[in-house]
Amino acid sequence: MIHVLDLKFQNKPDTIAAFLIETSAGPILVETGPYSTFKPLKEAVQGKGYTLEDIKHVFITHIHLDHAGAAWALAELGATIYLHPFGKQHMNAPSKLLASATRIYGEEGMERLWSTLKPIPAEQLKTVEHQEVITVGDTTLKAWHTPGHAVHHIAWQWGEELFAGDVAGVKIEGGPAMPPCPPPDINIEHWQESLRLIRSLKLNHIYLTHFGAIPAAQIHRHLDELEAGLLRWANWMRPHYEQGKKAAEITPLFQAFVKQQLAAAEVTEAQYDLYENANPAWMSVAGLLRYWRKKLEQ
């Protein structure tokens, strides 16, 4: 059984999820959220009849702080953390990850949004290859390496359920599928390949960290909408890059573009605030500019 745990990020609902799976060997967790939501995580796990100490296996889709920022705290309680090989060094020695995040969010934003990040001992970090299967009790999870949003991204398949992290986008309270495009790894072509892989799987649901379950009947429409949105964002950004505009100049224009897109989808102001909480438009400016710089100057 899968339990969707709302981590109440920034005291708002439906923004960041973790997922608790019950197995014969005890509960396992997919995603941890940031350490700033560790208390809501603890309370949500307790609400399902477990303690955090019961969780010995944690699967993260990628090492961005909204997905894996509390992994160290679960490791301190004895959990093994399963992740992409490219992520191990950054979770074991997070100085570069912290420096990169601080450049994006600033010192104040780091503390307010993500809180503390500590190293995880190498022996508690289990790297998982593409299509490798991990067995926990009577449960198996299969790793699909799914780059595009991040080079260290894994979508975890449990039976006909897929925990898709950010590669399957953001969808809040029935709104449109939106692509999170933070720096430094955005690669449109790789992302499209990952979406083709997901489309090829036989699934009952896709579980989005931002936020919740997409049922089988809606999966292909959701992924098509996400891909179209990803291309729309990238194509909007290209002329601004080619004109040599700076991120500070582009950001308010892009924010207005995204808000207009959400308004056209009849997203309410309350929903818009949740989208911005999960996937702030300003964050994608640097990611898309970097994508075009790498693509056009290589």
In which residue ranges do the predicted regions lie?
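Divalent-metal (often Zn2+) His-rich catalytic cores of metallo-beta-lactamase-fold enzymes
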Residues: L77, Q192-A247
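Short, glycine/acidic-enriched loop or turn micro-motifs at the edges of active sites
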Residues: F9, A25, P34, L65, ...
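Conserved beta-strand hairpin/beta-sheet module of binuclear metal-dependent hydrolase folds
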Residues: M1-L52, W156-G165
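Metallo-beta-lactamase
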Residues: H90-H145, V151-A217
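Active-site neighborhood of phospho(di)ester-bond hydrolases with catalytic His/Asp-centered motifs
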Residues: V30-G33, K56-I63, Y82-H84, T146-G148, ...
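Active-site metal-binding motif and surrounding structural segment of the metallo-beta-lactamase
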Residues: K39-F86
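C-terminal regulatory/interaction regions
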Residues: W236-Q298
